[in-house]
Amino acid sequence: TAEEVKNMVEKAHQHGIRIVFDGVINHTGPVTPQDAVWPENWVRTTPACDYKNYKNTTACTLVANLPDILTESEQNVDLPAALVEKWKKEGRYEQEVKELDAFFARTGYPRAPKYYIIKWLTDYITEYGIDGYRADTTKHLEEGVWAEFKKQCDYTFTDWKKNNPGKVLDNNAFYTTGEVSGYNISGGLYYDFGDKKVNYFANGFNSLINFEFKNEAKKDYESLFSYYSNTLQKELKGFGVLNYVSSHDDSTPFDGKREKTFESATKLLLTPGTAQVYYGDESARNLVIDGTKGDATLRSFMNWDDIKNDPSTQKTLAHWQKLGQFRKNHPSVGAGVHQKITAKPYVFSRRYSKENYSDQVVIGLDLAKGKKTISTGIIFQNGAKVKDAYSGKETVVVNGKVTIDSEFDLVLLELKK
């Protein structure tokens, strides 16, 4: 319900958690006995996409029975009769029409289908103060639509902050990430349709989901970390990628059998860029379910009982939590510059600075269990008190090195507060 959404956003914000909604402009969902197809001046029902070029990816139906919004249209259209009837039954018709009139008067847009939908999606910002959108099926409509979408999201988010000064979390702008299916970080700024390359970062997106990470994660730590750092600090400077090891509609996850849960966490959460933790990654939720069809195997029930009763699951979860908290506390981990300090043992630093803020950490992986001495490079001064956030042990930097005695084979060094 609307009240439940409101409570969810408010509770999340009270805990410093931002809310990103999934936003769709490409379609209105499948046709069912309860949900009739929308009018023909709103949607097309043929042809089906064959993805061989730009047109056959955008001006077509994504899959069977998923009518495609005519996002290329600039023609005025009336509201669908079914929607008008619904609003009148709910007693909200006059208010909805009043808001639409105000939106089109302010923006100057024609009353084309895409602009109605943009207005309806920005309503979630106006009404709840959500912080961002994950744009679904991004490549299946013209990129310019997303530029207009972001423009209206920015306007609405600024307006919401002005009207709700007590609820503002920070000065950050509205966040957008795009699901451009098949986009890879190796493509840099562009996605290639075959006959046309599109820069979605120049059309309203802060970041794009990176479909390549699950394969890149097979590399050794240094190759992985240095490549992502260099790419994000150079070609993609100012933008981001959203990495994942498993996802709701990717049938080939990095660790489908959950045999590399610790490695999955270490690589996902310590690689530069943004990390998407799919539910159950942190608890080794089963992704191989007998009798399922398609992506249903990726959407199994959460393994709450394992978290409560299984020591192995609890150990896995603790690893994800420690890395996740360290990442949360240190922007340098995901947004900073990566620098190798020593190859053996493998130790590296991350440094981040912006305006009057700076953050730096030193991380060691595949170390000896027990007592270990590692170099901290130029990150911490001699005499500095540091803490290993993984074990909780504290020590002092001496001659550019620290010694930690812990049962673990990794260290997460931060300045002791």
Predicted feature residues:
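Short, glycine/acidic-rich beta->alpha junctions
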Residues: 1-4, 116, 141, 257-261
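Active-site-proximal helices and loops of the catalytic beta/alpha 8
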Residues: 9, 13, 27, 119-237, ...
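Short Pro-Gly-centered flexible turn/kink motifs
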Residues: 409-415
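C-terminal substrate/ligand-recognition segments
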Residues: 269-276, 281
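A structural signal for short, well-ordered beta-strand segments and their strand-loop junctions
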Residues: 20-21, 134-135, 177, 244, ...
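Substrate-binding/active-site clefts of carbohydrate-active enzymes
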Residues: 1-128, 149, 153, 178-188, ...
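Active-site neighborhood of divalent metal-dependent phosphoester/pyrophosphate hydrolases
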Residues: 245-252
